[in-house]
């Protein structure tokens, strides 16, 4: 990966410097979950003066964030999320890594999908360090990942195809949820009819 991205580690913002609201939101491990950047779950902010003095940790559109710490042996981290175009100042906290692509031959969405692949996760978690309960992934392990990069046009095609299949899976899951709801309502109606002697 180090041929196409650079790594930025986070800053150790102190909880006693957090304020209720400001223009500077700190992105912590809990904000990167299940491959989404979630800004409204227990948001924390720092004062303008701290934000401005730690601007080197300011995130940019299309940065790829990943969680570097979790439960050892459980593979409950290395979640990734792409930073969207937003008007907030987002600051990178410790134990959240940032990959910033410097190659014009990379589709960021393709790279995000590759980082979710089983072979990448197997390679990453084979380098896990830490103690009995806490697992860690280092920046070097991440940058040393070997991934196949097809031509840019093929990357675009792969992204479109995968997004098409993911949309179909989402429809199936929604249909399954709707069906379960219908089954539950039907069972309830049958019980109601039986109780009232109408069966």
Please report, for each region that a protein language model flagged, where it lies by residue.
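Non-catalytic DNA-recognition/assembly elements of restriction-modification systems
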Residues: 1-11, 144, 148, 152, ...
């Amino acid at each position: 990966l180090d041929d196409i991205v650079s790594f930025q580690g986070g800053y150790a913002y102190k909880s006693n410097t957090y304020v209720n609201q400001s223009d500077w939101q700190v992105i912590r491990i809990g904000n990167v979950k299940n491959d989404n950047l979630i800004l409204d779950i227990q948001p924390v902010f720092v004062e303008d003066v701290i934000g401005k003095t730690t601007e080197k940790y300011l995130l940019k559109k299309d940065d790829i964030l990943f969680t570097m710490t979790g439960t050892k042996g459980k593979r409950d981290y290395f979640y990734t999320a792409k930073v969207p175009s937003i008007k907030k100042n987002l600051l990178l906290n410790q134990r959240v890594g940032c990959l910033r692509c410097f190659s014009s031959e990379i589709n960021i969405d393709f790279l995000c999908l590759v980082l979710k692949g089983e072979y990448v996760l197997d390679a990453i978690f084979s380098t896990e360090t830490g103690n009995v309960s806490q697992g860690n992934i280092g920046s070097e392990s991440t940058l040393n990942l070997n991934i196949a990069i097809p031509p840019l046009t093929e990357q675009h095609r792969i992204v479109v195809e995968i997004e098409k299949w993911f949309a179909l899976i989402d429809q199936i899951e929604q249909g399954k949820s709707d069906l379960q709801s219908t089954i539950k309502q039907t069972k309830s109606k049958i019980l109601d009819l039986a109780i009232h002697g109408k069966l």
